[in-house]
Structure formats: structure tokens, C-alpha cells
């Protein structure tokens, strides 16, 4: 998840785009599997799906959002979308919720009182490949 995602620019069919809230998503029905986005992503965040769906469509939860409740067909690209079906309902992404050590954090960086804003203010924070200008939304920190 980048503020200026190179993957969006290279998709020839606009199957990947940035939502108004900044989340980069993929529509698996539009994706033609050209893998241009995989080549453009400097973080290796894109994955090509070599397998057929493991879960039949009828087993999917009908209460989830359109972009997050789709069987990922063989031959399309996939990526993390911060579990937008969860975050838009006020929940944490699944990886944050189940992290056994609590080391994953998620929140509104624009809210100065949020946990993530406090971490950025008080910890030694860095982002990967900052020099590329993609402005990734993943921050890494450690205590000093």
C-alpha cells in the first residue's frame, strides 16, 4: 500500500486502482494476469495466482464487500488490501487482529491521538525504500 503506487500506473486494463481512502485494490474479474504490476512493485507485494480457487463461490460470505469476497481465479494478480471489508466496518485487518505478539498495528495516521500516530511520534520509525518516492504506508519501528 503506497500513497503513489507504481502498480496502478502500469495496469493496461485498469484492474488495479487506488480508492478514495488510499487503499490500492484489484478487481480479479478485470485482471488479465499480465504481471506488469508485479514488475512495477519494488516491495514484491504482488503475487500471481497459479492455482484454481480453493473455495467454491457458494461458500463465500455474502455479507462481505464486492472487492474482498471474490474467488481469486487462476492467472490473476493478488495483493493485500488491508482487509477493506473489515476496516471499512471499523475492524482491524485480519493479520493485526490475530497477531500473537501484538507487533502489528493499524490505525488512522491523521488522528494525532491514535496508537499509530503515537508510535510514529515516539519510536524510531522507518519505511522501506523511501528513496523511491512511493510513500509506502507500512512503517517499521523499534525501541531505542
Predicted feature locations:
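Non-ligating segments of multi-cofactor redox enzymes
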Residues: 1-144
Amino acid at each position: 500500500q503506497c500513497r503513489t503506487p507504481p502498480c496502478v500506473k502500469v495496469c493496461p486494463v485498469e484492474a488495479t486502482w487506488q480508492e478514495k481512502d488510499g487503499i490500492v485494490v484489484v478487481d480479479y474479474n478485470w485482471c488479465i494476469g499480465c504481471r506488469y504490476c508485479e514488475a512495477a512493485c519494488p516491495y514484491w507485494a504482488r503475487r500471481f495466482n497459479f492455482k484454481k480457487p480453493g473455495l467454491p463461490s457458494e461458500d463465500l460470505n455474502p455479507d462481505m464487500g464486492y472487492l474482498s469476497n471474490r474467488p481469486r481465479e487462476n492467472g490473476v494478480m493478488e495483493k493485500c488490501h488491508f482487509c477493506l471489508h473489515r476496516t471499512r466496518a471499523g475492524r482491524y485487518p485480519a493479520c493485526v487482529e490475530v497477531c500473537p505478539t501484538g507487533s502489528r498495528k493499524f490505525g488512522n495516521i491523521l488522528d494525532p491521538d491514535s496508537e499509530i500516530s503515537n508510535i510514529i511520534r515516539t519510536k524510531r520509525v522507518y519505511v522501506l525504500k523511501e528513496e523511491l518516492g512511493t510513500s509506502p504506508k507500512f512503517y517499521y519501528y523499534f525501541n531505542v
